[in-house]
Amino acid sequence: MKTIDLNCDLGEGFGAWEMGNDAAMIELASSVNVACGFHAGDPDIMRRTVELAKARGVSVGAHPGYRDLHGFGRHPIAGLKASEIENLVAYQIGALQAIATAAGHKVTHVKAHGALSNVACEDDMTAKAIAAGIKAVDPSLIFVVLANSKLVKAGEAANLPMVHEVFADRAYEDDGNLVSRKKPGAVLHDAKAIADRVVRMVQDGAVVSVTGKVIKMRTDTVCIHGDTHGAVEIARTLRQALKDAGIEVAPFKRGA
């Protein structure tokens, strides 16, 4: 039986402000990526999210981003040196590791957020700096990378365990990168269409771009954004579609 991990970005509120329905999404995901305070999240939200994950038996990963609360980590920050990127990644991983330890859970993976990830997918220096930050903290942490991107090469060079990610609710360009959120149609919302699309991704090991180009991609984990409108319905519909197709949802493992 084929298996696939469903990952979701959670803990992305701040103070009294909430983003998405974390309690519902965590029931449908097999792994979660927790905001670590730079683009969203704070110590209390991080703790609650980790405790929810522990209670549900869901693996937890750090979701580091640029220091950009105002822009939710979706604004690229130019001019950062490799050492600065490495340090901001290491800092955020360490913060979540401390919270996870306090909650009796463990951080298993790292997935870069928003603009940090988008820049790294096309920029060698940023990709290598993220990988270096992970390796410096714990070389056994799994690096979640956008399939076919520069993050893959950076992870390989750093000898990090990796899982390759595709996105359920995002459109793809012909080069395999995600369509910018600034463009119409970048974020998908039709639950049935998304579910059918993901089943094909898992079965075929490929995604279809906005122009209809078929791009072969290793598919270890599928991301559903918790802040996407209708995220809970999308996740429920997707899980049922995977079950109907004989595909088991299960957390990814080291060396997947």
Swiss-Prot record:
Q: Which biological process annotations from GO are given for this protein? A: carbohydrate metabolic process
> Which keywords has UniProt assigned to this entry?
ATP-binding, Hydrolase, Nucleotide-binding
Alphabetically, the GO molecular function entries are: 5-oxoprolinase (ATP-hydrolyzing) activity; ATP binding
Q: Specify whether Ligase is a keyword of the entry.
A: no
Pfam families assigned to the protein according to its UniProt record, in alphabetical order? LamB_YcsF
CDD domains, sorted: LamB_YcsF_like
Q: Which reaction does it catalyse?
A: 5-oxo-L-proline + ATP + 2 H2O = L-glutamate + ADP + phosphate + H(+)
Listed SUPFAM superfamilies: Glycoside hydrolase/deacetylase (SSF88713)
Q: Could you say which EC number(s) this protein's record lists? A: 3.5.2.9
Q: What class of enzyme is it?
A: hydrolase
Q: How does it assemble?
A: Forms a complex composed of PxpA, PxpB and PxpC.
What does this protein do, in the record's words?
A: Catalyzes the cleavage of 5-oxoproline to form L-glutamate coupled to the hydrolysis of ATP to ADP and inorganic phosphate.
Q: Which family does it belong to?
A: Belongs to the LamB/PxpA family.
What protein name does the entry list?
5-oxoprolinase subunit A 2
Which lineage do the record's taxonomy fields give for this organism? Answer: Bacteria, Pseudomonadati, Pseudomonadota, Alphaproteobacteria, Hyphomicrobiales
The UniProt gene name for this protein comes to pxpA2
